Amino acid sequence: MKILITGAASFLGRHLVEYFLSKNEEVLALARENARGMEELLKYKKNTGFKLTVLNMKDIEKLEDEFDICIHLAWGGIGKTGRMDKDIQTKNIVAAKNLMKLCKKKNAKRLLFAGSQAEYGQTLEDMENIYGKDFDINAIENQDENSSTNPKSEYGRAKLELKTELKKLGDGLNIEYVHMRIFSVFGRGDHETSLVSSCVNNFMENKDVYIGECLQSWNYIYVKDLCKAIYLLTVKELKNNYVFNIAGEKNQILMGYVRDMHRILKSKSNIIVEKREAPTEGTPFLKPSIELLKELGFKEDYGFEGGIKDMCAIK
């Protein structure tokens, strides 16, 4: 099958390109000009199953190639300011709808869209108001695909709007729509300022780590496990389900992940906790259920510890 991946130069996009090529699938990678990560894509140019197209999403109708499956990752305004910019997020909505229409013209049968945990909008502040500051994480229900949604950002609201709009549009065009609610992904090539990247870099050099309280529930999925999950969503019969949480099998307090990294890397660093101001949209509180994904046969190959060891080349 031939897979179109938009946002292919992104952290997730590059790993998906590599994964699908390893499965001997054809990959049509779409990336905007001067995209960060473009050089990483160029190393696949000698692969006969790979084609790179440099094109902005606003010009998506100019794409010439046909494809069977589309994985839509491209999205503007993912930074702190952009997440709250309604105009930017509205442009993302328009682009996604245009892509669905293009899928019809290109005879594609399924479109997978990168939704987000931000659609739920559940925050640490919400949980503390309900359960108190000494809450028991195990007493709080997991977020399944039918849990209530209350996005706190324009980014989350746009992703949630497309859950309904793309499903309706896809049904009318006879294209199967899959809405992937992706949680927190880590791995080699992620931004150096991400929590995992910064902790790993400092712990490996035995440098002290200055960090917030990390009291919220969290869920990490290793990028190679995420690729496996997305691959299953391209090839499996989905039994009329179309919204899937894409996350790891383990939920725990975020500080637990920090201490796990410290242990795995056998670091001598000090973990110095600082009181920090909560983000504008609140402190995300992630506690997903992935039972629907497991029904498709998903099981982590790496998990958190295996992922840290793999990205750091530790046996």
Task: Enumerate the predicted regions with their spans.
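N-terminal Rossmann NAD(P)H-binding glycine-rich loop of SDR-like oxidoreductase domains
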Residues: 3-23
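SDR active-site strand-loop-helix element
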Residues: 6, 30, 70-76, 111-117, ...
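Conserved glycine-rich Rossmann-like NAD(P)H-binding loop of the short-chain dehydrogenase/reductase
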Residues: 25-36
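NAD(P)H-binding glycine-rich loop region in Rossmannoid oxidoreductase-like domains
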Residues: 53-91
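Conserved Rossmann-fold NAD(P)-dependent oxidoreductase catalytic core, especially the SDR/UDP-sugar
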Residues: 72, 97-154
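Glycine-rich NAD(P)-binding loop of the Rossmann-fold in SDR/ketoreductase-type enzymes
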Residues: 87-95, 149, 153, 157-158
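NAD(P)-dependent short-chain dehydrogenase/reductase
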Residues: 125-135, 160, 164-218, 223-227, ...
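C-terminal substrate-binding subdomain of Rossmann-fold SDR/epimerase-dehydratase oxidoreductases
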Residues: 207, 211-315
